[in-house]
């Protein structure tokens, strides 16, 4: 998952047209999306660990790529945390009313 590049408007439209017979509640949708984010971050962690453990990773190109990958990972984890907080806040607001 690459967070630096802008999101395509077509992707947003496709995401808004999301219809599935399996997912029927807000809880299921949120759970499915967070599990997708978890899988993506697990993949990124394994890629980062692979890059760090590679003895050839000390050249400038590899270090620049590692820095970009770490930056994308950090942005993704921060975004997931923010979205989780916002989701919890929205659910609490709905439950109060």
Curated annotation (Swiss-Prot):
Keyword Transport: yes
Keywords: Plasmid, Protein transport, Transport, Virulence
Record keyword Flavoprotein present: no
Single biological process term from Gene Ontology: protein transport
Family affiliation: To S.typhimurium PrgJ.
NCBIfam families registered for this protein in UniProt: T3SS_SctI
Function statement: Necessary for the secretion of IPA invasins.
Protein name: Protein MxiI
Species of the source: Shigella flexneri
Top-level taxonomy: Bacteria, Pseudomonadati, Pseudomonadota, Gammaproteobacteria, Enterobacterales
